[in-house]
Amino acid sequence: MRVSKYLLSTQKETPANAEVISHQLMLRAGMIRRNASGLYTWLPSGLRVLRKVEAIVREEMNKTGAIEILMPLVQPADLWVETGRWDKFGPELLRFQDRNNRDFVLGPTHEEVITDLVRKELSSYKQLPLTLYQVQTKFRDEVRPRFGVMRAREFLMKDAYSFHLDQETMDNTYHAMHTAYSNILTRMGLSFRPVLADTGSIGGSMSHEFHVLANSGEDLIAYSTGSDYAANIEKAESPMPTHTLAAPTEAMTLVDTPNAKTIAELVEQFNVVITKTVKTLIVKGATDEVPLVALVIRGDHELNEIKADKLELVASPFEFASETEIRAAVGAGPGSIGPVGLTMPIIVDHSVTVMSDFAAGANAEDKHYFGINWDRDLPLATAADIRNVVEGEPTPDGLGTYAMARGIEVGHIFQLGTSYSKSMNATVLDENGKAQVLLMGCYGVGVSRIVAAAIEQNNDDRGITWPEAIAPFTVGILPMNMHKSHRVADIAEKLYQDLADAGVEVLMDDRKERPGVMFADMELIGLPHVVVIGDRNIDAGVFEYKNRRTGEKQDIPFDEIVAFLTNAAKG
């Protein structure tokens, strides 16, 4: 492709409303343009990357034996009513009526449509297991679209759904999808981690997220330094204490703490060791009989709301009690709450069960107890894992310690069980002629999100540094002053044609532009391999080659350049 015949709409300045580097670079490199909040047009360079990502995803799906279909973006509301999600889904579900006043939605996901299809098309166990997938546009009316295509309202996604009668084939398909997702991201040249994830409101028995590692990632991943274990911070298991409860060495004393509303203030003003303090958090209870529950964690730890949400006594969805509710129940504000004397159920983190001589709120305004000890001052409460793990703690497999990394979720696989098939009566006859509800798996990849995530991981101060497999073009040719030099023009044209004939995707900048502009644009769009042609190089019989990712430069003889670049393009 010649730039003179191409739409290369680069921008020098960073757009003011672009918060993250991928959004900035996609706009500056002429990959996307904003139409409205969360809606984007993909320009030629962006679309080339998107299609390459899509092709790799499709190839790996086909290898698993999954069969491609295409479902409609517009879905009838009746299906959503059937599963109960018509009422459960919030305003992110865009609803509208056709001219006959029938309700429809723009699909944010396709579980209802695929389950409806399968219950009509499948009748026998002989047709199972079956995996169907599509690459389709989705729409979610996000309250605040941000980060460009990272969190857009309209996005491209691959979603696959598998159907089974037994757990064994479900597990086999799940494992195949796990492998396929790893292959997808490996082929794209991205650093990533599959992590154990919470199944959330969807439910099911197993869930993994696939995260592209990037410092700008919104998700915190806890992984083992000595094994493949990794989990989303909400799912990572905290280790059990390795020491036992020590005997008391202090008497419990009531202390006035008028200016200590937080653990940090208590530690600073009273010279207390933070690991000798606890935080008591009051949350909504699951029943009218138990309206409030106290959760107690060590002062330097953070409550894990996902773990707390799963506790039998705690309301789901998880919700903190209001200050009014706390004062009515305890007689003090949130900064003065502690476990001593509380009449509501108390659940403590495992780490708190081995604490002695610790400090906590006294359930009286501006007062704390110091020197609290279990059994002596209050009965040992029910214990559970309710906190986030901390870097350096042992991982549950015993093979390493926790380290932390930031990640961008680009894929998610679930074992759904019968969540949708049961509510929609999706059954087939088993070998005994008895109707059985189908087991389902769900496997999603954010195709357009991968593009942004790849840029978040692969960039420098000059622009994008594309991995080979998903770059818009493999080679960029920069002929210096070709409109003034016939030699440069002739050799550039020959190299361009030779590379095209060899199947290499090449972009030649044949514009009448200053060299500085040409170099800046080529580095901005991030093509992996750049060849510079000038009169001085021609005199020496070499091309100047630069690797965009490593910055390495070398001179390549004329007769070796095509073979060199062809091999480089193969990675």
From Swiss-Prot:
Reactions that this protein is recorded to catalyse: tRNA(Pro) + L-proline + ATP = L-prolyl-tRNA(Pro) + AMP + diphosphate
Record remark: domains: Consists of three domains: the N-terminal catalytic domain, the editing domain and the C-terminal anticodon-binding domain.
Record localization: Cytoplasm
GO annotation (BP), single: prolyl-tRNA aminoacylation
Domain of life: Bacteria
InterPro entries: aa-tRNA-synt_IIb (IPR002314), aa-tRNA-synth_II (IPR006195), aa-tRNA-synth_II/BPL/LPL (IPR045864), Anticodon-bd (IPR004154), Anticodon-bd_dom_sf (IPR036621), Pro-tRNA-ligase_IIa (IPR002316), Pro-tRNA-synth_IIa_bac-type (IPR004500), Pro-tRNA-Synthase_IIa_type1 (IPR023717)
This protein's name: Proline--tRNA ligase
Entry keywords, A to Z: Aminoacyl-tRNA synthetase, ATP-binding, Cytoplasm, Ligase, Nucleotide-binding, Protein biosynthesis
GO MF annotation terms: aminoacyl-tRNA deacylase activity; ATP binding; proline-tRNA ligase activity
Source species: Shewanella frigidimarina (strain NCIMB 400)
First-listed, main subcellular location of the protein, grouped into a coarse class: cytoplasm
Similarity remark: Belongs to the class-II aminoacyl-tRNA synthetase family. ProS type 1 subfamily.
Function field: Catalyzes the attachment of proline to tRNA(Pro) in a two-step reaction: proline is first activated by ATP to form Pro-AMP and then transferred to the acceptor end of tRNA(Pro). As ProRS can inadvertently accommodate and process non-cognate amino acids such as alanine and cysteine, to avoid such errors it has two additional distinct editing activities against alanine. One activity is designated as 'pretransfer' editing and involves the tRNA(Pro)-independent hydrolysis of activated Ala-AMP.
Description of how the protein assembles with itself and partners: Homodimer.
Gene designation per UniProt: proS
Class of enzymatic activity (EC top level): ligase
One GO CC term on file: cytosol
Pfam families referenced in this protein's UniProt entry, alphabetically: HGTP_anticodon (PF03129), tRNA-synt_2b (PF00587), tRNA_edit (PF04073)
EC number of this enzyme: 6.1.1.15
